[in-house]
Amino acid sequence: MMKSSNKSSGSLIRLDKKHIYIQTLGCQMNVHDSEQIAALMEEKGYICTEDANEADLIILNTCSIREKAAQKAKSQLGRYRNLKRKKRNLLIGVGGCLAQQLGDELLTKVPDIDFIFGTHNIHQLPDFISRIEKSRKKIVETTLHPSTPSIGVLALPCNGQVSSFVTIMQGCNNFCSYCIVPYVRGREESRPPEDIIHEIRMLADHGVKEVTLLGQNVNSYARKTSGEMGFAELLREIEKIKGIERMRFTTSHPKDLSEFLITAFSDLSKLCHHIHLPFQSGSDRILALMNRGYTKSDYLAKVERLRTVCPDISITADVIVGFPGESDEDFKETIDMMNQIRFDNLFSFKYSEREGTAAVKMDGKVSEPLKLERLQILQALQEQHTLEKNKAMEGKQEDVLVEGFSKNCRKDLTGRTSTNKIVNFSGCVDLIGDMVSVLIKEAYLHSLRGEMLCEEVVHAN
């Protein structure tokens, strides 16, 4: 959780301060949105808590990209409703994509909610809370304002925090036929480059070593006019910031992956050798129905170019099975593409119908049992590929940015390679924030086990 830039110093906590509990569902953008919410509410005097039972204010930051995520949010609201019945003055707020999508309808379904705010209204939260505290009247605000005030909210990192998210843009103009994002995040809107640079310098001044740039489609950053700075140029400016040692970004759209951006992987020393490049299907027919704007051969050509420019690049992707009209042959083409590319990792999903998208009206719905069967086949294959990729790293020496203690064993440190592989190894707490050299001894499906080479320790500046 991020700290507010105006948080008062000192170790004593005032007993009259209120507590806020934030639960986040969904993507990295939502995670960072929650960090910004925490910063805003800390400035208002709230203290973040990890225990919903002691909260005076609960905010659920929701996702609606798939039905499973939406149902999880609704289920969680039922639990919070029970808390509210025990604690009359508890305020419950709902934000994120499900809030944006349903608005007043969500309030009708769950009347215990006190306020609903959309994806473009985060910066208005302090005002919403003040109004509710005074009047106890419910608020629903999901207007798609210009989003820059919300995505530009600054939050300082916690002590010892090594990596931070930085939102550079919000929204999407692509309207893939299965995707609700353009409807809940709005059209593409980019933050001014000077604001982004200022935020990253601030993070560097507070000890952050790695930034991950966020956007629904970072490749289309500031493309409205030819005179604006593009994404590859932005990366080149961030490269110059003292104290920042690594840059990452997500997510990229294959059709917008330019040669200038591809060559950045060899030109920029701070740009990590990893790209998340959703391919969604290996069938040209399905890609056209999805309105993806590229073909299988287009995608393969970009992968080949990436691997030519940066031979050790790690490539991960998203894929959907069971899209309307997907035949056995279409699915086979997806499997063939996976075997051809051999992704480092893959985020795979069954097609989930989202109201308001073009795919809802398409014929050829695939049954749930068949979707599940295809998903299981695909995931089993990807596990083979992921383990194969990880095993290939055994015996190699990797630079690892130490992020903190391992979740699995508090005696171990954990960090990531440039290729975004998690590495666990023995070491002391003083190494957090340092770039260290680690010999990879053993590979697993989701992580690597290594041994730090003491003579290769390089303390970050």
From Swiss-Prot:
Residues where [4Fe-4S] cluster 1 binds: C27, C63, C97
NCBIfam families linked: miaB-methiolase, MiaB/RimO family radical SAM methylthiotransferase
Reactions accelerated catalytically: N(6)-dimethylallyladenosine(37) in tRNA + (sulfur carrier)-SH + AH2 + 2 S-adenosyl-L-methionine = 2-methylsulfanyl-N(6)-dimethylallyladenosine(37) in tRNA + (sulfur carrier)-H + 5'-deoxyadenosine + L-methionine + A + S-adenosyl-L-homocysteine + 2 H(+)
Task performed by this protein: Catalyzes the methylthiolation of N6-(dimethylallyl)adenosine (i(6)A), leading to the formation of 2-methylthio-N6-(dimethylallyl)adenosine (ms(2)i(6)A) at position 37 in tRNAs that read codons beginning with uridine.
Named cofactor requirement(s): [4Fe-4S] cluster
Protein name stated in the entry: tRNA-2-methylthio-N(6)-dimethylallyladenosine synthase
Broad EC category: transferase
Protein's cellular compartments: Cytoplasm
GO molecular function: 4 iron, 4 sulfur cluster binding; metal ion binding; N6-isopentenyladenosine methylthiotransferase activity
Binding sites annotated in the UniProt record for [4Fe-4S] cluster 2: C172, C176, C179
First-listed, main subcellular location of the protein, grouped into a coarse class: cytoplasm
Subunit structure, as described in the record: Monomer.
Domain MTTase N-terminal positions: 18-134
Radical SAM core domain: residues covered: 158-388
Domain TRAM: 391-454
InterPro entries cross-referenced by the UniProt entry: Elp3/MiaA/NifB-like_rSAM, Methylthiotransferase, Methylthiotransferase_CS, Methylthiotransferase_N, Methylthiotransferase_N_sf, MiaB_methiolase, rSAM, rSAM_horseshoe
Keywords, alphabetical: 4Fe-4S, Cytoplasm, Iron, Iron-sulfur, Metal-binding, S-adenosyl-L-methionine, Transferase, tRNA processing
Family: Belongs to the methylthiotransferase family. MiaB subfamily.
